[in-house]
Amino acid sequence: MADLPETPAFGAAFSDEEEAARALEAGRWLFSQTCSFVMGCVSLDTLPDHDLSEIAFAGRSNVGKSSLVNALTGRKTLARTSNTPGRTQELNYFRLGPEAQDPALMMVDLPGYGFAEAPKDAVKRWTRLIMAYLRGRPALRRVCLLIDSRHGIKENDRDVMRMLDEAAVSYQIVLTKADKLKAAEITDVLARVVAETAKHVAAHPDVIVTSSQSGAGIDLLRAQLAALASP
Ligand SMILES: Nc1nc2c(ncn2[C@@H]2O[C@H](COP(=O)(O)OP(=O)(O)OP(=O)(O)O)[C@@H](O)[C@H]2O)c(=O)[nH]1
Ligand SMILES: [Mg+2]
Protein backbone atom coordinates (compact mmCIF):
# COMPACT_ATOMS: atom_id res chain seq x y z
CA MET A 1 0.00 0.00 0.00
CA ALA A 2 3.02 2.27 -0.25
CA ASP A 3 1.53 4.10 -3.21
CA LEU A 4 -1.83 4.93 -1.62
CA PRO A 5 -2.75 8.43 -2.74
CA GLU A 6 -2.54 11.01 -0.01
CA THR A 7 -6.09 11.59 1.16
CA PRO A 8 -7.37 15.16 1.11
CA ALA A 9 -7.67 14.94 4.87
CA PHE A 10 -3.97 15.35 5.22
CA GLY A 11 -3.95 18.69 3.55
CA ALA A 12 -7.28 19.99 4.81
CA ALA A 13 -7.39 18.73 8.37
CA PHE A 14 -4.22 20.40 9.62
CA SER A 15 -2.97 23.91 8.97
CA ASP A 16 0.72 22.99 8.80
CA GLU A 17 3.19 20.15 9.26
CA GLU A 18 3.77 20.95 12.91
CA GLU A 19 0.07 20.75 13.68
CA ALA A 20 -0.19 17.50 11.70
CA ALA A 21 2.73 16.01 13.66
CA ARG A 22 1.14 17.03 16.97
CA ALA A 23 -2.25 15.57 15.97
CA LEU A 24 -0.68 12.31 14.79
CA GLU A 25 1.23 12.00 18.06
CA ALA A 26 -1.92 12.72 20.11
CA GLY A 27 -3.80 10.08 18.09
CA ARG A 28 -1.07 7.46 18.53
CA TRP A 29 -0.94 8.19 22.26
CA LEU A 30 -4.68 7.97 22.88
CA PHE A 31 -5.14 4.81 20.85
CA SER A 32 -2.23 3.13 22.65
CA GLN A 33 -4.08 3.54 25.97
CA THR A 34 -6.30 0.94 27.59
CA CYS A 35 -9.37 0.03 25.56
CA SER A 36 -11.96 -2.18 27.16
CA PHE A 37 -15.34 -3.56 26.27
CA VAL A 38 -18.03 -1.84 28.33
CA MET A 39 -21.31 -3.42 27.24
CA GLY A 40 -23.47 -4.55 24.33
CA CYS A 41 -26.88 -2.86 23.98
CA VAL A 42 -29.97 -4.17 22.22
CA SER A 43 -32.27 -1.27 23.07
CA LEU A 44 -32.02 2.48 23.47
CA ASP A 45 -33.07 2.39 27.12
CA THR A 46 -30.02 0.34 28.06
CA LEU A 47 -27.42 2.70 26.57
CA PRO A 48 -24.80 3.60 29.18
CA ASP A 49 -24.77 6.88 31.08
CA HIS A 50 -21.39 8.59 30.87
CA ASP A 51 -19.89 11.99 30.16
CA LEU A 52 -17.51 11.06 27.32
CA SER A 53 -17.77 11.78 23.61
CA GLU A 54 -19.15 8.89 21.56
CA ILE A 55 -17.75 7.95 18.18
CA ALA A 56 -19.86 5.44 16.27
CA PHE A 57 -18.76 3.13 13.47
CA ALA A 58 -21.63 2.65 11.04
CA GLY A 59 -21.99 1.13 7.59
CA ARG A 60 -23.35 -1.77 5.57
CA SER A 61 -22.95 -5.28 6.94
CA ASN A 62 -19.43 -6.64 6.38
CA VAL A 63 -17.91 -3.27 5.40
CA GLY A 64 -15.23 -3.68 8.08
CA LYS A 65 -16.53 -1.75 11.14
CA SER A 66 -15.34 -4.17 13.81
CA SER A 67 -12.02 -4.69 12.00
CA LEU A 68 -11.50 -0.91 11.99
CA VAL A 69 -12.09 -0.70 15.76
CA ASN A 70 -9.46 -3.43 16.16
CA ALA A 71 -7.00 -1.72 13.78
CA LEU A 72 -7.39 1.65 15.53
CA THR A 73 -6.70 0.12 18.93
CA GLY A 74 -4.00 -2.22 17.64
CA ARG A 75 -5.91 -5.21 18.99
CA LYS A 76 -6.84 -8.24 16.90
CA THR A 77 -9.80 -9.58 18.83
CA LEU A 78 -11.27 -6.67 20.79
CA ALA A 79 -14.29 -6.50 18.48
CA ARG A 80 -15.47 -9.75 16.91
CA THR A 81 -15.18 -9.86 13.13
CA SER A 82 -16.37 -12.39 10.58
CA ASN A 83 -16.68 -13.17 6.90
CA THR A 84 -20.40 -13.57 7.47
CA PRO A 85 -22.38 -10.31 7.18
CA GLY A 86 -24.36 -9.79 10.38
CA ARG A 87 -21.62 -10.66 12.87
CA THR A 88 -22.21 -7.65 15.15
CA GLN A 89 -25.79 -7.66 16.44
CA GLU A 90 -25.61 -5.23 19.36
CA LEU A 91 -24.34 -1.70 19.91
CA ASN A 92 -20.98 -2.60 21.39
CA TYR A 93 -19.39 0.05 23.62
CA PHE A 94 -15.64 0.28 24.10
CA ARG A 95 -14.00 2.80 26.42
CA LEU A 96 -10.65 4.12 25.20
CA GLY A 97 -8.31 6.09 27.42
CA PRO A 98 -6.49 5.98 30.74
CA GLU A 99 -8.57 4.76 33.67
CA ALA A 100 -10.47 7.47 35.58
CA GLN A 101 -8.66 10.16 33.69
CA ASP A 102 -9.21 12.30 30.63
CA PRO A 103 -8.90 12.40 27.67
CA ALA A 104 -11.06 9.45 26.79
CA LEU A 105 -13.59 8.33 24.19
CA MET A 106 -16.43 5.84 23.91
CA MET A 107 -16.28 3.95 20.64
CA VAL A 108 -19.49 2.27 19.52
CA ASP A 109 -19.23 -0.61 17.05
CA LEU A 110 -22.68 -0.84 15.44
CA PRO A 111 -24.40 -3.73 13.68
CA GLY A 112 -24.47 -3.27 9.90
CA TYR A 113 -27.41 -2.29 7.74
CA GLY A 114 -28.39 -3.98 4.46
CA PHE A 115 -28.06 -7.68 3.71
CA ALA A 116 -27.06 -9.90 6.62
CA GLU A 117 -27.03 -13.64 7.10
CA ALA A 118 -29.34 -13.54 10.10
CA PRO A 119 -33.09 -13.99 10.68
CA LYS A 120 -35.11 -11.19 9.03
CA ASP A 121 -36.75 -10.17 12.31
CA ALA A 122 -33.39 -9.75 14.00
CA VAL A 123 -32.03 -7.66 11.10
CA LYS A 124 -35.16 -5.44 11.18
CA ARG A 125 -34.86 -5.00 14.94
CA TRP A 126 -31.21 -3.96 14.90
CA THR A 127 -31.66 -1.74 11.82
CA ARG A 128 -34.40 0.19 13.65
CA LEU A 129 -32.15 0.40 16.69
CA ILE A 130 -29.14 1.72 14.72
CA MET A 131 -31.21 4.40 13.00
CA ALA A 132 -32.83 5.55 16.26
CA TYR A 133 -29.43 5.63 17.95
CA LEU A 134 -27.79 7.58 15.12
CA ARG A 135 -30.59 10.16 15.00
CA GLY A 136 -31.07 10.74 18.69
CA ARG A 137 -27.98 10.23 20.81
CA PRO A 138 -26.81 13.53 22.34
CA ALA A 139 -23.37 12.12 23.32
CA LEU A 140 -22.64 11.19 19.70
CA ARG A 141 -19.87 13.50 18.48
CA ARG A 142 -19.00 11.84 15.19
CA VAL A 143 -20.21 8.97 13.06
CA CYS A 144 -17.53 7.24 11.02
CA LEU A 145 -19.60 6.09 8.05
CA LEU A 146 -17.70 3.24 6.46
CA ILE A 147 -17.91 2.61 2.72
CA ASP A 148 -16.26 -0.38 1.03
CA SER A 149 -13.82 1.19 -1.43
CA ARG A 150 -14.59 -1.55 -3.98
CA HIS A 151 -18.27 -0.64 -4.07
CA GLY A 152 -18.46 3.10 -3.36
CA ILE A 153 -21.56 4.77 -1.88
CA LYS A 154 -24.73 2.65 -2.25
CA GLU A 155 -28.37 3.70 -2.05
CA ASN A 156 -28.80 2.61 1.58
CA ASP A 157 -25.66 4.59 2.50
CA ARG A 158 -27.28 7.63 0.87
CA ASP A 159 -30.41 7.09 2.99
CA VAL A 160 -28.24 7.15 6.12
CA MET A 161 -26.33 10.23 4.91
CA ARG A 162 -29.61 12.09 4.33
CA MET A 163 -30.91 11.04 7.73
CA LEU A 164 -27.72 12.30 9.43
CA ASP A 165 -27.90 15.57 7.47
CA GLU A 166 -31.48 16.09 8.68
CA ALA A 167 -30.60 15.23 12.27
CA ALA A 168 -27.48 17.47 12.07
CA VAL A 169 -25.22 14.65 13.25
CA SER A 170 -21.61 15.12 12.15
CA TYR A 171 -20.27 12.21 10.11
CA GLN A 172 -17.10 11.34 8.28
CA ILE A 173 -16.79 8.95 5.37
CA VAL A 174 -14.11 6.29 5.82
CA LEU A 175 -13.28 4.13 2.82
CA THR A 176 -12.36 0.59 3.88
CA LYS A 177 -10.47 -2.39 2.43
CA ALA A 178 -8.21 -0.18 0.28
CA ASP A 179 -5.71 -3.05 0.13
CA LYS A 180 -8.07 -4.77 -2.30
CA LEU A 181 -7.72 -2.02 -4.93
CA LYS A 182 -4.97 -0.71 -7.18
CA ALA A 183 -3.77 2.86 -6.54
CA ALA A 184 -5.55 4.19 -9.66
CA GLU A 185 -8.83 2.61 -8.57
CA ILE A 186 -8.50 4.20 -5.14
CA THR A 187 -7.89 7.61 -6.72
CA ASP A 188 -11.03 7.12 -8.79
CA VAL A 189 -13.36 6.03 -5.98
CA LEU A 190 -11.95 8.71 -3.67
CA ALA A 191 -12.71 11.45 -6.21
CA ARG A 192 -16.28 10.21 -6.66
CA VAL A 193 -16.89 9.89 -2.93
CA VAL A 194 -15.38 13.31 -2.12
CA ALA A 195 -17.57 14.95 -4.81
CA GLU A 196 -20.72 13.31 -3.47
CA THR A 197 -19.83 14.02 0.17
CA ALA A 198 -19.42 17.72 -0.60
CA LYS A 199 -23.18 17.90 -1.26
CA HIS A 200 -24.05 16.76 2.26
CA VAL A 201 -24.25 19.41 4.94
CA ALA A 202 -23.37 17.28 7.96
CA ALA A 203 -20.54 15.39 6.25
CA HIS A 204 -16.96 16.16 7.24
CA PRO A 205 -15.18 17.27 4.05
CA ASP A 206 -12.25 14.87 4.56
CA VAL A 207 -12.68 11.33 3.32
CA ILE A 208 -10.13 8.92 4.77
CA VAL A 209 -8.88 5.90 2.82
CA THR A 210 -8.10 3.00 5.14
CA SER A 211 -7.12 -0.62 5.24
CA SER A 212 -7.42 -2.45 8.53
CA GLN A 213 -5.26 -5.12 6.97
CA SER A 214 -2.29 -2.99 5.84
CA GLY A 215 -2.77 -0.19 8.37
CA ALA A 216 -3.10 2.49 5.67
CA GLY A 217 -4.92 5.60 6.88
CA ILE A 218 -5.22 4.31 10.45
CA ASP A 219 -2.86 6.87 12.00
CA LEU A 220 -4.69 9.67 10.24
CA LEU A 221 -8.07 8.50 11.49
CA ARG A 222 -6.61 8.14 15.01
CA ALA A 223 -5.43 11.76 14.82
CA GLN A 224 -8.84 13.03 13.74
CA LEU A 225 -10.75 11.05 16.36
CA ALA A 226 -8.37 11.92 19.20
CA ALA A 227 -9.24 15.57 18.60
CA LEU A 228 -12.82 14.74 19.67
CA ALA A 229 -11.88 13.10 22.97
CA SER A 230 -13.39 14.42 26.21
CA PRO A 231 -12.82 16.90 27.73
N1 LIG B 1 -8.78 -7.26 2.85
C1 LIG B 1 -9.38 -6.67 3.88
N2 LIG B 1 -10.39 -7.30 4.52
C2 LIG B 1 -11.00 -6.65 5.54
C3 LIG B 1 -10.62 -5.34 5.93
N3 LIG B 1 -11.43 -4.97 6.94
C4 LIG B 1 -12.26 -6.00 7.17
N4 LIG B 1 -12.01 -7.02 6.33
C5 LIG B 1 -12.70 -8.31 6.27
O1 LIG B 1 -14.06 -8.08 6.00
C6 LIG B 1 -14.90 -9.00 6.72
C7 LIG B 1 -15.90 -8.24 7.56
O2 LIG B 1 -15.20 -7.53 8.56
P1 LIG B 1 -15.92 -7.04 9.88
O3 LIG B 1 -14.97 -6.14 10.57
O4 LIG B 1 -16.47 -8.19 10.65
O5 LIG B 1 -17.11 -6.20 9.24
P2 LIG B 1 -18.35 -5.50 9.99
O6 LIG B 1 -18.66 -4.28 9.21
O7 LIG B 1 -18.06 -5.35 11.44
O8 LIG B 1 -19.48 -6.59 9.74
P3 LIG B 1 -20.90 -6.79 10.52
O9 LIG B 1 -20.64 -6.71 11.99
O10 LIG B 1 -21.32 -8.16 10.10
O11 LIG B 1 -21.80 -5.72 10.02
C8 LIG B 1 -13.93 -9.87 7.54
O12 LIG B 1 -13.70 -11.07 6.84
C9 LIG B 1 -12.68 -9.02 7.64
O13 LIG B 1 -11.50 -9.77 7.77
C10 LIG B 1 -9.54 -4.72 5.24
O14 LIG B 1 -9.12 -3.58 5.50
N5 LIG B 1 -8.97 -5.43 4.22
MG1 LIG C 1 -19.09 -5.97 13.09
UniProtKB/Swiss-Prot annotation:
PROSITE patterns: G_ENGB (PS51706)
GO molecular-function terms, A-Z: GTP binding; metal ion binding
Gene Ontology cellular component annotations, sorted alphabetically: cytosol
Residues annotated for GTP binding in this entry: 59-66, 86-90, 109-112, 176-179, 210-212
Binding site for Mg(2+): 66, 88
CDD domains to which the protein is assigned, alphabetical: YihA_EngB
Job of this protein: Necessary for normal cell division and for the maintenance of normal septation.
UniProt-recorded name of the protein: Probable GTP-binding protein EngB
Annotated source species: Rhodospirillum rubrum (strain ATCC 11170 / ATH 1.1.1 / DSM 467 / LMG 4362 / NCIMB 8255 / S1)
